[in-house]
């Protein structure tokens, strides 16, 4: 089977870190000669630190993979993962849509690769100083989950401060946009997918809902009644279910061994449910950290998510859905998409929010709700409002959609960057 061009746009993956380095010590050549175990490639990679606050020794670590073909003419994509506090390099670059996936001690090709707001803006400004040849490129800011805060807030700041970036659009997947609606949609998802009983659904909606539980847990004031409800929900769902994709198996030692064999055979149609374990092992290798020009300061090991950087958890409750409206009114294209097997931020809440925003903005439906295709199969459903605000689902996809549905995610994202409608009929030719 032939595959599409490997990396179709340059992608920056950025993660906030705390460093005790001087500017001189991190301003050297960031070019990555080669990552340990990687296959031969025809594109350049860079990794290093961009200081955003010299006084407090704060920096963003980035990994940048150029487009494989004609990199000088391809758009630039900034990808931010959520959490808060989770790694865009570990999750986005190595588990989802970066150029490689780890497999044991080596890296294998990913054929469906996608090659606090003020801090992110400072990062972009300084990154463009380091890479001035990219400043005129079309820029798209993208992310998932809690990046439903980071991404629109960064785009809003670029517009408000009239920063001269060529910002064209934002895309956010399974995003946290409104605390109550997003979190309370879990109950319906659990019940409709057979994960909880009728009586537990009733308790989870009328006695104590998930937004109440989350709010109380954050403030450490969980009441006995809410504690009983969430224990019952957890008991029925089972801890052996992956809530980020309820159809996906969990990683077990025997599966990990099998996954490494399959990956080395480059069976790219298989989902490696143990990719996080393999990524964790790979990124904790000293030779890999040296190749990335990375330095662990204040922590013993790299982890997917960390609380070393402190986040105000109350910010979870700050709604960002109306920021999307401001961006759309400013002419910035907005795509909100949902992996339809995610129970953490289910599509039902997201669809309700986007539909409500379109009504609030007075946007007419320009593409009625319909199926879209990836190759010969239905890949999801989509609706477009005013040719500026789009909602789409990715069929069979997880919270991290490119992880479980890389091909469909690539079709969605490529169409959005090109300003094209999602394919509305089956293609008999696979690329």
PLM feature segments, named:
Residues 2-431:
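Terminal and linker regions of secretory-pathway proteins
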């Amino acid at each position: 089977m032939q595959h599409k061009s490997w990396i179709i746009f340059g992608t920056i993956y950025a993660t906030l870190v705390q460093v005790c380095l001087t500017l001189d010590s991190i301003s050297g050549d960031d070019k990555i000669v080669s990552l340990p175990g990687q296959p031969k490639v025809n594109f350049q990679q860079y990794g290093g630190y961009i200081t955003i606050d010299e006084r407090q020794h704060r920096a963003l670590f980035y990994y940048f993979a150029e487009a494989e073909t004609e990199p000088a003419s391809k758009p630039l994509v900034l990808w931010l993962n959520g959490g808060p506090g989770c790694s865009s390099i570990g999750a986005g670059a190595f588990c989802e849509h970066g150029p490689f996936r780890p497999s044991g001690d080596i890296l294998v090709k990913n054929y469906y690769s996608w090659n606090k707001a003020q801090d992110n803006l400072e990062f972009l400004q300084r990154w463009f100083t380091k890479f001035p040849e990219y400043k005129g490129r079309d820029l798209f800011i993208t992310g998932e989950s809690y990046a439903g805060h980071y991404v629109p807030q960064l785009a809003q700041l670029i517009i408000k401060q009239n920063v001269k970036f060529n910002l064209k659009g934002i895309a956010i997947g399974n995003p946290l946009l409104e605390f109550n609606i997003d979190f309370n949609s879990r109950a319906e998802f659990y019940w409709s997918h057979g994960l909880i009983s009728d009586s537990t659904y009733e308790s989870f909606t009328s006695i104590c809902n998930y937004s109440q539980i989350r709010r109380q847990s954050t403030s450490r004031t969980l009441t006995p009644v809410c504690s009983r409800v969430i224990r019952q929900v957890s008991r029925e769902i089972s801890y052996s279910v992956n809530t980020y994709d309820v159809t996906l198996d969990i990683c077990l030692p025997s599966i990990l061994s099998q996954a490494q064999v399959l990956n080395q055979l480059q069976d790219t149609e298989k989902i490696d449910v143990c990719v996080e374990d393999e990524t964790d092992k790979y990124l904790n290798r000293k030779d890999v950290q040296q190749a990335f020009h990375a330095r662990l300061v204040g922590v013993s090991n790299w982890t997917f998510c960390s609380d070393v950087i402190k986040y105000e958890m109350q910010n979870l409750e700050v709604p960002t859905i109306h920021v999307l409206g401001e961006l759309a009114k400013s002419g910035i294209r907005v795509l909100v998409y949902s992996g339809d097997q995610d129970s953490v931020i289910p599509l039902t809440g997201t669809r309700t929010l986007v539909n409500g925003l379109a009504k609030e903005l007075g946007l007419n439906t320009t593409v009625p709700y319909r199926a879209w295709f990836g190759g010969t199969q239905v890949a999801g459903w989509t609706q477009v409002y005013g040719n500026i605000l789009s909602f789409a689902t990715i069929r069979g996809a997880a919270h991290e959609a490119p992880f479980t549905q890389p091909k469909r995610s690539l079709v969605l994202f490529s169409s959005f960057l090109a300003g094209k409608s999602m394919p509305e009929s089956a293609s008999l030719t696979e690329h």
